[in-house]
């Protein structure tokens, strides 16, 4: 009886205080948080309340990304063997597969209401890369929310992308193989923040030059300053 009571208490705690809810993403309208829990995508109001499960596939669903109108969510899933990009309504329903490459593809942002940027390592030949990446130096591609053939958006790594309403991109670069979680790193290959504005010249502009790590930029609501 004591063991049974302990097991029941442990189960109750796991349900009331779940752990390892990851990859949180706040909707652009500021009302809802999408997150990953036990390999599925959930949403919950920012003020708290009951979470709604959006995906129920036995595969691993992760990395939710909101559309600009806060009505759809793109995510990565390995339900067909490797990570592909899927899209689903925030109300639930059957997700639609958008990419089909045998490599790993992960959504990073909506470039606009009709297109999703995703990271992948699928360059076709050695002539297209600067040095061997071992999957670490991923390119950025763009695909329509209706599906179709993806197009190359950036041959260089653009990590932790944040896009404002004008379409200007903030991202962190990647210069080497250094461990992402190495403490107190100060080196020439530490990450820096860059801005990419397609309609400006120069289109790329380095915003930080600290010897340590500068990373994970996020636009402020005004679209002019960032964290």
Task: State where each predicted segment sits.
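Boundary at the C-terminal end of the N-terminal hydrophobic targeting segment
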Residues: 12-16
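A flexible loop/linker signature enriched in serine peptidases of the S9 family
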Residues: 17-18, 36-42, 50, 55-61, ...
